[in-house]
Swiss-Prot record:
It is found in: Cell inner membrane. Residues 2-184 form the tr-type G domain. This is Elongation factor 4. It catalyses: GTP + H2O = GDP + phosphate + H(+). The keyword Cell inner membrane applies. Required for accurate and efficient protein synthesis under certain stress conditions. May act as a fidelity factor of the translation reaction, by catalyzing a one-codon backward translocation of tRNAs on improperly translocated ribosomes. Back-translocation proceeds from a post-translocation (POST) complex to a pre-translocation (PRE) complex, thus giving elongation factor G a second chance to translocate the tRNAs correctly. Binds to ribosomes in a GTP-dependent manner. Its EC number is 3.6.5.n1. Belongs to the TRAFAC class translation factor GTPase superfamily. Classic translation factor GTPase family. LepA subfamily. It comes from Variovorax paradoxus (strain S110). The gene is lepA. It is a peripheral membrane protein. PROSITE patterns: G_TR_1, G_TR_2. GO terms for molecular function: GTP binding; GTPase activity; guanosine tetraphosphate binding; ribosome binding; translation elongation factor activity. Signal peptide: none annotated. NCBIfam families: lepA (TIGR01393), small_GTP (TIGR00231).
């Protein structure tokens, strides 16, 4: 065990984490030169395109150190984006050390800090690395002082490197071997292995990525999941080098995979402990008595409705979501029915990027055509009888008379930016009802801390933050508490009928404005009918905005040249009566763009 090192790489998006991983794999001969490609650990197309890492991947490498010994290095790649922080904490809990990669030309950014704190909380040894030293504008001294100021770890011997040119790779490998501790665990004890990740493979079923803490696992042994109690045969075990390399056994301290012919992913929950079954007890007794401390269940923060464009596609959307859930344990979904859109699902996501990626994967990998409703957050509603209920969907909000208060989720937001953009960012945060808690200068970087309602962030805060700061600002947020607030539900009515999928929950101060904006946007989108269509925005029974789409009508007076006015009146009255009758039985089709229009209403 003394020759094993488990480590991961922490970095902000685009600071060169995946490229550094490629270099380490290449240097240790993990893949043949011809198999080497850029971002070898990012296996999804969407990861390569967006240049982000979503799923954690692993690689087992052999490194011959300068002291002549051969070490087994297990690299566990982590995502950098704040939406995937759950994947990060899982990856880190399987490691003893982490490389903190900071772009020497940009310095420390928000998500680096968030993930680094996660690592320090888990007691992981952090080794700072300054990447992109080959750039002409690299400023290692500034980056070092930022690491010390913002994160508070000693960066005097941070290793300068360039993942692109290969500079400093050997120094990094030496630091991994000498600075990071060997795994702790009892190699002779009963088997306990933690499931770090699991995903579904169409050929072999569920593949579990495990970190063996105590004991050893031999191919073909009977294993048991401690949380679910399910039992299987470990048919195939091995390690990823990133390619699969089957092994006869996995020892304590190693990170590898188990394939046990599991059909449904619920059986192999991430964070569960795998142990052996004592031979001869018929599966009654497991060898280990207590499970490893798992991970906390993650709560989705953002909810949206996903509906198939064709009602007949409902079943295939359900299958697609089930398959996606196999690879993404943080996705939540449940069926829901909307009068406007038919049958679909209410899905819970960790954040906006997560939502976008799930949507894109559904469309790309499973050929789904989707209608997505506006994202919303979970509100706490206190009823008149004192009962507290959680409302995920605006259309499920009780009537105004039946509740005493609504509490909205408040998050603490950390914003990092160069000091010339502070004014613009502060203005934006104030527009979003943010309350400034703190402001700190670190060299030329400024860190602002705000408390803001999550509902204000989910729509477009991130996009606007990037545009007011020309892309330099970065943010992360964590949930703080629920707080009573004056928020109201705005319903959109078409000819007096509520369209449930268009309801939005907004602060009262913005309700009039938002209502008017949505209504006028809808007027542009809905095509003219044979009868007048009234589009209204209402809070409870009070109408706050209205637009009318005038009817298409034939000129019934075209055939009257001269003649008496009463003749013309009669024809007009007759047309009017027909339109009125049509309006009673006619229905208005709401096009897909109308649901997206809500997302584009500017503040």
């Amino acid at each position: 065990m003394n020759h094993i090192r488990n480590f991961s790489i922490i970095a902000h998006i685009d600071h060169g984490k995946s490229t550094l991983a490629d270099r380490l794999i290449q240097r240790c001969g993990g893949l043949a030169e011809r198999e080497m490609e850029a971002q070898v650990l990012d296996s999804m197309d969407i990861e390569k395109e967006r240049g982000i890492t979503i799923k954690a991947q692993t690689a087992a490498l052999h490194y011959k150190a300068l002291d002549g010994q051969v070490y087994n290095l297990n690299l566990i790649d982590t995502p950098g984006h704040v939406d995937f922080s759950y994947e990060v904490s899982r990856s880190l809990s399987a490691c003893e050390g982490a490389l903190l990669v900071v772009d020497a030309s940009q310095g420390v950014e928000a998500q680096t800090v968030a993930n680094c704190y996660t690592a320090l909380d888990l007691g992981v040894e952090v080794v700072p690395v300054l990447n992109k030293m080959d750039l002409p504008n690299a400023d290692p001294d500034n980056a070092r002082s930022e690491i010390e100021d913002v994160i508070g770890i000693d960066a005097t011997d941070a290793i300068p490197c360039s993942a692109k040119t290969g500079l400093g790779i050997d120094e990094i490998l030496e630091a991994i071997v000498h600075k990071m501790p060997a795994p702790r665990g009892n190699p002779d004890g009963p088997l306990r292995a933690m499931i770090v990740d699991s995903w579904f493979d169409p050929y072999v079923g569920v593949v579990m990525l495990v970190r063996v803490v105590d004991g050893r696992l031999v191919k073909g042994e009977r294993i048991k999941m401690m949380a679910s109690g399910a039992m299987y045969n470990a048919d195939n075990i091995g390690v990823f080098t990133p390619a699969n390399e089957p092994r006869a056994s996995l020892e304590a301290g190693e990170v590898g995979y188990i394939i046990a012919g599991i059909k449904e992913l619920q059986a192999a929950k991430v964070g569960d402990t795998v142990t052996l079954i004592k031979p001869g007890t018929g599966g009654a007794a497991a060898t280990a008595t207590e499970a490893l401390p798992g991970f906390k269940e993650i709560q989705p923060q953002v909810f949206a409705g996903l509906y198939p464009t064709e009602a007949s596609e409902y079943d295939s959307l359900r299958d697609a979501l089930e398959k996606l859930k196999l690879n993404d344990s943080s996705l939540r979904y449940e069926p829901e029915v909307s009068q406007a859109l038919g049958f679909g699902f209410r899905c819970g996501f960790l954040g906006l990027l997560h939502m976008e990626i799930v949507q894109e994967r559904l469309e790309r990998e499973f050929d789904q055509d989707l209608i997505t409703t506006a994202p919303s957050v979970v509100y706490q509603v206190v009823r008149n009888d004192g009962e507290v209920i959680m409302v995920e969907n605006p259309s499920k909000m009780p009537d105004v008379g039946k509740m005493s208060e609504i509490r909205e989720p408040i998050v603490t937001v950390h914003l990092y930016m160069p000091q010339e953009y502070v004014g613009a960012v502060m203005t934006l945060a104030n527009q979003k009802r943010g309350v400034q808690m703190n402001m700190a200068y670190h060299g030329r970087q400024v860190m602002l801390t705000y408390e803001m309602p999550l509902g204000e962030i989910v729509l477009d805060f991130f996009d606007k933050l990037k545009s007011v700061s020309r892309g330099y600002a970065s943010m992360d947020y964590e949930f703080k508490e629920y707080r009573a607030s004056d928020v109201v539900k705005v319903d959109i009515l078409l000819n007096g009928e509520k369209v449930d999928a268009l309801s939005i929950i907004v602060h009262r101060s913005q309700s009039q404005y938002r209502g008017r904006a949505v209504v006028s946007k809808m007027r542009e989108i809905i095509s003219r009918q044979m009868f007048d269509v009234a589009i209204q925005a209402a809070i409870g029974v009070n109408i706050i905005a209205r637009e009318t789409i005038k009817a298409l009508r034939k000129n019934v007076l075209a055939k009257c040249y001269g003649g008496d006015i009463t003749r013309k009146k009669k024809l007009l009255e007759k047309q009017k009566a027909g339109k009125k009758r049509m309006k009673q039985i006619g229905s208005v089709e709401v096009p897909q763009e109308a649901f997206l229009a809500i997302l584009q209403v500017e503040d």
